[in-house]
Amino acid sequence: MLEATGRVVMVSGASRGIGRAVVECLIAGGYHVSAAVRDPRGLVGSDRLMLHRYDAESLPSAEAWVAATIERFGRLDGLINAAGINPEADLTDPDETALDAMMLINVKAPMRLIRLALPHLAKSGEGRVVNVASMSGKRVRNPNAGYAMSKFALLALTHAVRQYGWEHGIRATAICPSFVATDMTAHVTKWPREKMSDPRDIAELIATVLRLPNTATIAELLVNCRLEDML
């Protein structure tokens, strides 16, 4: 297993939910973390935690975040794409606003960050990319076609990174959770909140993936809080 000490990881979506749990877990584990937030107010940085304002809709914002991370820490060993949105984009809805937003935030933004991070991850020799996808990226079980499409696309992106980065020591993993007890699932009524996965447990799994050596890599990790009847 790789040692965390001295390794630098960027985490998007760090203001809340899984992203914030990942930041807390990695800091506790000894990593240096560059955390992307929409609004850094209310959060406190430290010698190992850098907070950076990031707008997932903006390419210049992504460029600025990666550049600031390298300027601060001098290296980059991992990228966790945890930012995401899930508005309704029904198959029959003629309004494509929500669909466009999800494809931008859930797919294009991670791709931009990965593209910008690749040279630095390759320099590490043990670079890691973890994309927080969803069980909705493995099967479709509700009318929100747009969300499922975005997560299927994120899985495809993960495998593209594996193909491109393999000879450079870059390993990519898609984490595919079902219901996680965050504000993104606050509207869910068909499954009890107390039976949903804890974001801290998802964070621990991500931390484990980061520590795996180049010779033991996971392409996709499915995490569920209930029994699957189909995949």
Spell out what each predicted region is.
Residues S15-R16:
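Conserved glycine-rich cofactor-binding loop
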Residues A82-P87:
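Conserved NAD(P)H cofactor-binding loop of Rossmann-fold oxidoreductase domains
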Residues D90-L91, D95-D100:
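Substrate-binding pocket helix/loop in short-chain dehydrogenase/reductase
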Residues I114, S150:
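Active-site helix of classical SDR
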Residues S134:
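Residue(s) in the substrate-gating loop at a strand-loop-helix junction
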Residues R139, A160-I170:
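Active-site-adjacent segment of SDR/Rossmann-fold oxidoreductases
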Residues E167-I170, A174-I175, W191-L231:
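C-terminal helical subdomain
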